[in-house]
């Protein structure tokens, strides 16, 4: 599952992969597409605009046309709340 959220004015995409939560910027590094509108398969998110893919756990760009990695953020669950480190 993928969910778009805004935290302290920053648009993020949250992903559930094998029971773990991961977070990246919500904007693709290649074009103005929201990753939260993309297709998640395993740990790979496909950009809905040009079908480039990223590893949501590491942010690594996996295939053309994306070449720049996407920023990831540390996530932890505390008292059933998702806590995201924006630094």
Swiss-Prot record:
Pathway in which this enzyme or protein is active: Aromatic compound metabolism; naphthalene degradation
Residues annotated as domain Rieske: 1-84
Pfam families: Rieske
GO MF annotations in UniProt: 2 iron, 2 sulfur cluster binding; metal ion binding
Keyword set, alphabetical order: 2Fe-2S, Aromatic hydrocarbons catabolism, Electron transport, Iron, Iron-sulfur, Metal-binding, Plasmid, Transport
Biological processes per GO annotation: catabolic process
Gene3D superfamilies for the chain: Rieske [2Fe-2S] iron-sulphur domain
Cofactor(s) the protein needs: [2Fe-2S] cluster
Signal peptide (residue range): none
Described purpose of this protein according to its UniProt entry: Component of the naphthalene dioxygenase (NDO) multicomponent enzyme system which catalyzes the incorporation of both atoms of molecular oxygen into naphthalene to form cis-(1R,2S)-dihydroxy-1,2-dihydronaphthalene. Functions as an intermediate electron transfer protein via a specific interaction with iron sulfur protein components (ISP) (NdoB and NdoC).
Protein known as: Naphthalene 1,2-dioxygenase system, ferredoxin component
Lineage: Bacteria, Pseudomonadati, Pseudomonadota, Gammaproteobacteria, Pseudomonadales
